[in-house]
């Protein structure tokens, strides 16, 4: 389970949340390195940061040192919407190559600080760019990859984008964990992610209902029956 930790109160709530769930909790950190430290101290099983928006190298190191103390993984997240200006200028625009360069630079920064308990994530709302970035990153990265199409959209549009993007990536054997990002109830994200994995033969369980699109031979309420 992933929870955003924008305040100290949110960080302190992690301990209570952990008492009520049976799965690991990931703290999503934006900008304030102190929230990462507080989240770790309050029981986060993993933290997600973008070192590029945490601040100075000293602040990143403070987070890395705390993660090392508690031996929890850091997910290094790179997003097409916040790619560094110098990399965008180098490639002329946001590109898959630029996303990979940014991710590997951040990984090296943390490795140089003496830590390698890492997970890497590259996300974009551009399906084909995201797929290409993962194809480029996978052979260069020894760490687990968290895969997702960010800002995919509302339930209908977001499910289609996520299914296509994740399908391309996962079908190449790339990816260790996934997230479907939808604007709506996050419970729908879980159902969609499970169905994508089942469709690709990567998850078992449940029943697959096979139903035709209806035709002139249909003489029952097939749509209602299938939905039921």
Where are these regions (language model features)?
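Catalytic beta/alpha-barrel core
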Residues: 1-7, 24-31, 47-55, 99, ...
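N-terminal active-site wall of soluble small-molecule enzyme domains
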Residues: 2-42
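Hydrophobic or amphipathic alpha-helical targeting/insertion segments
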Residues: 23, 34-75
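Catalytic alpha/beta core domains of metabolic enzymes, predominantly
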Residues: 79, 87-228
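Glycine-enriched alpha-helix->loop->beta-strand junction motifs that scaffold or abut catalytic
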Residues: 20-23, 41-47, 68-70, 138-144, ...
């Amino acid at each position: 389970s992933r929870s955003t930790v924008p305040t100290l109160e949110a960080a302190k709530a992690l301990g209570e949340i952990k008492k009520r769930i049976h799965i690991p909790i990931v703290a999503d950190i934006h900008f304030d390195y102190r929230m990462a430290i507080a989240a770790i101290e309050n029981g986060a099983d993993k933290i997600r940061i973008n070192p590029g928006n945490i601040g100075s190298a000293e602040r990143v190191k403070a987070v890395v040192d705390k993660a090392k103390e508690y031996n929890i993984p850091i997910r290094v997240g790179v997003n097409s919407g916040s790619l560094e200006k110098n990399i965008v200028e180098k490639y002329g625009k946001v590109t898959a190559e630029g996303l990979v360069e940014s991710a590997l630079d951040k990984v090296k920064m943390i490795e140089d600080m003496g830590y390698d308990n890492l997970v890497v994530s590259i996300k974009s709302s551009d399906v084909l760019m995201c797929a290409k970035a993962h194809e480029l990153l996978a052979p260069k990265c020894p760490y687990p990859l968290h895969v997702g199409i960010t800002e995919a959209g509302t339930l209908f549009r977001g499910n289609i984008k996520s299914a296509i993007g994740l399908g391309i990536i996962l079908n190449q054997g790339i990816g260790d964990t996934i997230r479907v990002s939808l604007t709506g109830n996050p419970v729908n994200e879980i159902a969609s992610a499970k169905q994508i994995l089942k469709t690709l033969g990567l998850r078992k369980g449940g029943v697959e209902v096979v139903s035709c699109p209806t035709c002139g031979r249909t003489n029952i309420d097939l749509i209602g029956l299938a939905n039921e």
